[in-house]
Amino acid sequence: VILTPQAMTQPAETARGIAACNRRSKPILVSFMGGQNVMPGREELVASGLPDYESPERAVAALRAMCDYAAWLRRPPRVVTRFPVNRRRADRIIQRHLKTREYEIGEASAKDILRAYDFTVQPGQLAATAAEAVEAAGKLGYPIVMKIASPDVIHKSDVGGVKLNLNSPTAVLDAYDLMMMRIGARMPDARIHGVYVEKMCESGREVILGMVRDPQFGPMLMFGLGGIFVEVMKDVTFHIAPITQDEARQMLESTKSFALLKGVRGQAGVDFDAIATSLQRISQLVTDFPEIVEMDINPFIVAPPGRISVAADARITLKDSA
């Protein structure tokens, strides 16, 4: 019901008439517009328990929220999948870091935790020296990726901490020396454990999967466009864990990048089921281990259906017990 004051308008009488109708089962939303001229009517509405909205738009928004809530009440029971995982292996890694007060879990150990929860990660090896990096590359097979291994370097690409498509021992040695020189100059106080040498994975779309633990809502799962674009596009969505397959799918569809991931101009779309399942696995991981306060897989290389999607980089932060 919308009312604007005219010469013969009686706001109080109108409000009492609306209040009388409120005894029926139909919801009534009222917007009396006119400031002090309609104040007697607004007071009558408040006294009768009817909300009076400042504008019709706010009334419609409230009605939409009521409809959404009714639909939520009618939804079928939630089924949260529990996957068979190696929880004991993940627990050993987490407890080791807690014992040594290393609350930032680096890529190598973070990927070991992901493996325990059945994520696919590329074969890789931590190398403390340039010679070890060359040896690791020879074992893994070229081409390889080299990434700085440091708990203090979060955004590796920003400081020259990632080198792609290295195809020879000479390229590995040169990349190692240049990486150490650049990071030493830009972050002289950073703790450097060496480099992480990893087999190059097939190309695909880059997305980010993650979680941040909110003090009130608990673990909040995150999905969005990944790689370097997550900082620029800021197209991410969140959902409280634990999560169902349908809820994970709704997360994907709620982003602006969903249309891009479906495929444009002849490009194949990505395997959305693989992303949804991976979000469920993160949900299970962070529910199993409340010690995890933050984590992300960025990028998660997602391929078209029929190909394997890969966790290309990962980090996990544990709760500081001090």
Regions found by a protein language model. Give the residues of each.
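ATP-dependent carboxylate/acyl-activation modules
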Residues: 1-6, 11-322
